[in-house]
Amino acid sequence: MQTNKKQNWRFRQAISLALFSLLICGIVFPLLITGLAQIFFPNQANGEIVQFNGQAVGSNLIAQNFTLTIFFHPRNDSASGVDPDITLQDAYSQIPRIQDATGIPTDALNQMVNQNTEGTYWVFGSPYVNVLRLNLALVRAYPLIYNGFQ
């Protein structure tokens, strides 16, 4: 009888610990972190939504599926397939295709890539370009070429 009570007590203890852990790890902690993110990093916490002409057109954090030859394309070889950034080398390698498709001078496209280049943290990584921002810069700079995308 004593052993049975002891086993029941341990079972209740185990269930209580599991429920407490579930409550803390599954509800309290995520709500706390989400609340702190909304307070200190509201733009990032909401996905860095990009607005164009008053409409949401994408996120700076997730690659968009640009397939037309008149736009820069994101990396298709990233592990997740949603990497929003490309290297400078990748951006420069796409310039001839865009120049052929749009007639925009190569120098202007090079300048556009340079203006939209982001640095890195100290010595880590290499400079990169956000594809969505770069394509929106093209649409803004050349409204006659990209008039169906405004």
For each feature predicted by the language model, list its residue ranges.
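Short amphipathic alpha-helical segments at helix boundaries and their inter-helical linkers
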Residues: 116-133
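Short alpha-helix boundary/capping motifs
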Residues: 43, 64, 126-127, 137, ...
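Short, low-complexity, Pro/Ser/Thr/Gly-rich segments in the mature regions of secreted, periplasmic
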Residues: 135-150
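Flexible, solvent-exposed loop/hinge segments and secondary-structure transition points
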Residues: 5-9, 13, 17-21, 25-26, ...
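N-terminal leader/signal peptides at the extreme start of proteins
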Residues: 1-2
